[in-house]
Design a protein with these regions (language model features):
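Active-site neighborhoods and metal-handling regions in enzymes and metal-associated proteins
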Residues: 1-158
Length: 158
């Protein structure tokens, strides 16, 4: 029987065996899998940490500046400027043709909303801002939800 605590299942003692079995299964099925030893040095780990630090600072900056009435294109501009001012690159920009530096999803847009000069934040909106940063070749990715003005209890639960 699986153990649950507040909806979280404990990993079994043989968790690594289960993961290894799944990896071997996918290899047999012909899937290409990345090396499990992608990180080799402290320098590489430091690069990822610095990318993540910039990415998190960017989300904090957005927290301080996001407001009712601004367009999603203004959020994109903030992301581009902040990221490049920190000698980094916004990863989504021009990736596979994506035209912007950030994904901004309002209310019922599930993910990867494209910023626009015609879409404005209104009181009651919940907004997901998804940022990805490349710093010296190291990637980081995170998103954060923001509530604009007075948000209904139903929307807050999302």
């Amino acid at each position: 029987m699986k153990k649950f605590v507040k909806g979280v299942r404990f990993a079994p003692k043989n968790y690594s065996d289960e993961v290894e079995a799944k990896i071997q299964h996918y290899k047999r099925e012909g899937y290409k899998l990345p090396s499990r030893h992608l990180l080799r040095t402290e320098e590489q780990l430091a690069g990822i940490r610095e990318s993540a630090r910039i990415n998190t600072a960017l989300l904090d900056y957005i927290s301080e500046n996001i407001r009712e009435g601004m367009s999603t294109a203004e959020i994109d501009h903030m992301v581009y400027c902040f990221t490049t001012d920190h000698d980094a690159i916004p990863a989504p920009f021009l990736y596979e043709g994506f035209p912007k530096s950030v994904c901004v999803s309002i209310n019922d847009v599930v993910c990867h909303g494209i910023p626009s000069t015609k879409e404005f934040l209104r009181s009651g909106d919940i907004v997901n801002v998804d940022v990805s940063t490349i710093y010296k070749g190291y990637f980081s990715d995170a998103s954060r939800m923001y509530m604009i003005g007075e948000v209904s209890p139903e929307m807050q639960r999302l």
